[in-house]
C-alpha cells in the first residue's frame, strides 16, 4: 500500500498485515499480529493490538481500543483473538477486548454494525450483523447478540446473557436476563417526585411561594380529570405565583415528548 495513506506519526509494528487502500491517521498504534483488510480507515489515536483482524471498509474513530487483553483476573496471556467483520463503524472511545480461554478464545463481531461513542464489548462476546449500540452501551463477557438488535444509550448487559435477533433494549436499562428475539425491554423511566425545593431555596426563591408551587403541581399531575383543564384551573388559582406561572408556560409549549408524572 502507499505510504501516503499512513500518517508519519503512526506506529506500525513489523508483521502487521495491511490490505489495499488502508488509511491510518495520526498517532495510531498497530500491533505485529494485526490484520487490516482493504479500505479500513483509522482516523487518529486508534490502538489495535493482539491477534486482531478488522474487516474491509470498517472505519474506526479516535481513541478506540481494539484487541486488548480481557479484563479478568484469571487471564494468563493466552493467545486469544478479536475478529471484526466488514463495513462496521466504530466511534470514539469504543473498547473491544480479546477472548479468553473460558470463552472460546475469540471475541467476534459481524458486519454492518454501528458502535457509538464509548461502547464497551467485553471478552468472548459474539455479536451479529446490522446491530446498533448507542452511546456508552456496556456488554460484559460471553454475551451473544443476534442480528438487527438495537441497544439504547447507557444500557448494560450482564455476562452470559443472550440478546435475540431484532430485539430492542431501551435506554438506561440494566439487562440481567436473556431477551427473546423481537422482544422490547426497558427499565423504569424517571418519575416526577416534586420540586427542587432545596435548590430553589439556595437560589433565593421565596419559601412560601415554593411550597405553594409544590401544591400546584400536585393538583396538575395527581388530580383526576382532563389534564389541559387542570392546567387552566391551576393557572387561574395560582396566577400570582411566579413559579407556578413559569411551570404553566412550560406546560403550554409544544413538545414532542410527554411530561414526567408522579408515580402511580
Swiss-Prot record:
<keyword id="KW-0441">Lipid A biosynthesis</keyword>
<keyword id="KW-0808">Transferase</keyword>
<keyword id="KW-0012">Acyltransferase</keyword>
<dbReference type="GO" id="GO:0008780">
    <property type="term" value="F:acyl-[acyl-carrier-protein]-UDP-N-acetylglucosamine O-acyltransferase activity"/>
</dbReference>
<keyword id="KW-0677">Repeat</keyword>
<dbReference type="GO" id="GO:0016020">
    <property type="term" value="C:membrane"/>
</dbReference>
<comment type="function">
    <text>Involved in the biosynthesis of lipid A, a phosphorylated glycolipid that anchors the lipopolysaccharide to the outer membrane of the cell.</text>
</comment>
<dbReference type="InterPro" id="IPR011004">
    <property type="entry name" value="Trimer_LpxA-like_sf"/>
</dbReference>
<comment type="pathway">
    <text>Glycolipid biosynthesis; lipid IV(A) biosynthesis; lipid IV(A) from (3R)-3-hydroxytetradecanoyl-[acyl-carrier-protein] and UDP-N-acetyl-alpha-D-glucosamine: step 1/6.</text>
</comment>
<dbReference type="Pfam" id="PF00132">
    <property type="entry name" value="Hexapep"/>
</dbReference>
<dbReference type="InterPro" id="IPR001451">
    <property type="entry name" value="Hexapep"/>
</dbReference>
<keyword id="KW-0443">Lipid metabolism</keyword>
<comment type="subunit">
    <text>Homotrimer.</text>
</comment>
<keyword id="KW-0963">Cytoplasm</keyword>
<protein>
    <recommendedName>
        <fullName>Acyl-[acyl-carrier-protein]--UDP-N-acetylglucosamine O-acyltransferase</fullName>
        <ecNumber>2.3.1.129</ecNumber>
    </recommendedName>
</protein>
<dbReference type="GO" id="GO:0005737">
    <property type="term" value="C:cytoplasm"/>
</dbReference>
<keyword id="KW-0444">Lipid biosynthesis</keyword>
<dbReference type="InterPro" id="IPR029098">
    <property type="entry name" value="Acetyltransf_C"/>
</dbReference>
<comment type="similarity">
    <text>Belongs to the transferase hexapeptide repeat family. LpxA subfamily.</text>
</comment>
<dbReference type="InterPro" id="IPR010137">
    <property type="entry name" value="Lipid_A_LpxA"/>
</dbReference>
<dbReference type="Pfam" id="PF13720">
    <property type="entry name" value="Acetyltransf_11"/>
</dbReference>
<dbReference type="InterPro" id="IPR037157">
    <property type="entry name" value="Acetyltransf_C_sf"/>
</dbReference>
<dbReference type="GO" id="GO:0009245">
    <property type="term" value="P:lipid A biosynthetic process"/>
</dbReference>
Amino acid at each position: 500500500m502507499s505510504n501516503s495513506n499512513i500518517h508519519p506519526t503512526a506506529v506500525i509494528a513489523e508483521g502487521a498485515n495491511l490490505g489495499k487502500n488502508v488509511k491510518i491517521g495520526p498517532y495510531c498504534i498497530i500491533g505485529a499480529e494485526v490484520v487490516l483488510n482493504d479500505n479500513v480507515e483509522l482516523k487518529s489515536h486508534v490502538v489495535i493490538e493482539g491477534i486482531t483482524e478488522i474487516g474491509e471498509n470498517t472505519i474506526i474513530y479516535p481513541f478506540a481500543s481494539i484487541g486488548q487483553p480481557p479484563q479478568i483476573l484469571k487471564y494468563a496471556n493466552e493467545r486469544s483473538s478479536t475478529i471484526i467483520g466488514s463495513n462496521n463503524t466504530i466511534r470514539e472511545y469504543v473498547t473491544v477486548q480479546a477472548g479468553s480461554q473460558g470463552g472460546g478464545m475469540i471475541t467476534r463481531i459481524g458486519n454492518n454494525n454501528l458502535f457509538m461513542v464509548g461502547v464497551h464489548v467485553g471478552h468472548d462476546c459474539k455479536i451479529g450483523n446490522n446491530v446498533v449500540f448507542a452511546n456508552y452501551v456496556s456488554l460484559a463477557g460471553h454475551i451473544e447478540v443476534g442480528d438487527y438488535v438495537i441497544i439504547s444509550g447507557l444500557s448494560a448487559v450482564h455476562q452470559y446473557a443472550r440478546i435475540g435477533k431484532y430485539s430492542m433494549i431501551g435506554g438506561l436499562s440494566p439487562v440481567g436476563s436473556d431477551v427473546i428475539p423481537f422482544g422490547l425491554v426497558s427499565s423504569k423511566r424517571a418519575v416526577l417526585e416534586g420540586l427542587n425545593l432545596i435548590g430553589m431555596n439556595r437560589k433565593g426563591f421565596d419559601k412560601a411561594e415554593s411550597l405553594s408551587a409544590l401544591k400546584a403541581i400536585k393538583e396538575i399531575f395527581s388530580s383526576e380529570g382532563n389534564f389541559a383543564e387542570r392546567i387552566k384551573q391551576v393557572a387561574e388559582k395560582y396566577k400570582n405565583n411566579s413559579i407556578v406561572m413559569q411551570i404553566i408556560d412550560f406546560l403550554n409549549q409544544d413538545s414532542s415528548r410527554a411530561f414526567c408524572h408522579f408515580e402511580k
